[in-house]
């Protein structure tokens, strides 16, 4: 595994894991097979300089998105795959956020001990939602390779 304390390595790792998970979903959920997901590579934000003058960076807006109608059965498959896949990665703390499930909005979160996150959000079709699935990532602040 790469040294994930380095910003560039962590960004590459999380994008690779999100891509790998998207491919798994495409093979497990029929309606996601052969779909063209939209990728956003996000943007880098720079934190305030520390006492040595070095600045940590974080990555926000890593995202795969797809407007597609899914079923509750699909959501169950996705949750199982999400839990199974991400517990074997650096973001092993898995949480299901069930506050909005009564309005057909499902959210699963994988988080690391230092604040990295990968989130899967699913909106099922109804009067409040545009049906879609989104995988988004956040890389917590780290120093660039050149700062070591």
Give the role of each language-model region.
Residues 1-55:
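N-terminal leader/targeting segments
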Residues 11, 29, 38, 58-59, ...:
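Mitochondrial intermembrane space
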Residues 21, 25, 108, 120-122, ...:
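Hydrophobic beta-strand residues in large extracellular and virion-surface proteins
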Residues 34-49, 94-118:
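Ser/Thr-rich, low-complexity intrinsically disordered terminal regions
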Residues 53-105:
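Long, charged/polar, surface-exposed segments that mediate recognition or autoinhibition
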Residues 61, 117, 132:
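Broad gene-expression machinery/nucleic-acid interaction feature
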Residues 112-114, 123-148:
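Non-cytosolic coordination micro-motifs
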């Amino acid at each position: 595994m790469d040294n994930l304390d380095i910003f560039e390595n962590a960004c590459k790792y999380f994008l690779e894991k999100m891509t790998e998970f998207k491919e798994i979903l495409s093979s497990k959920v029929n309606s996601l097979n052969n779909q063209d997901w939209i990728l956003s590579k996000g943007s880098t934000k720079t934190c305030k300089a520390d006492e040595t003058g070095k600045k940590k960076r974080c990555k926000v807006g890593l995202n795969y998105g797809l407007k597609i109608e899914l079923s509750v059965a699909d959501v169950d498959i996705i949750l199982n795959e999400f839990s199974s896949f991400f517990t074997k990665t650096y973001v092993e703390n898995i949480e299901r956020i069930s506050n909005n499930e009564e309005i057909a909005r499902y959210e699963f979160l994988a988080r690391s001990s230092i604040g990295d996150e990968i989130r899967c959000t699913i909106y099922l079709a109804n009067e409040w939602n545009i049906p879609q699935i989104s995988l988004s990532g956040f890389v917590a602040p780290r120093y660039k390779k050149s700062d070591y």
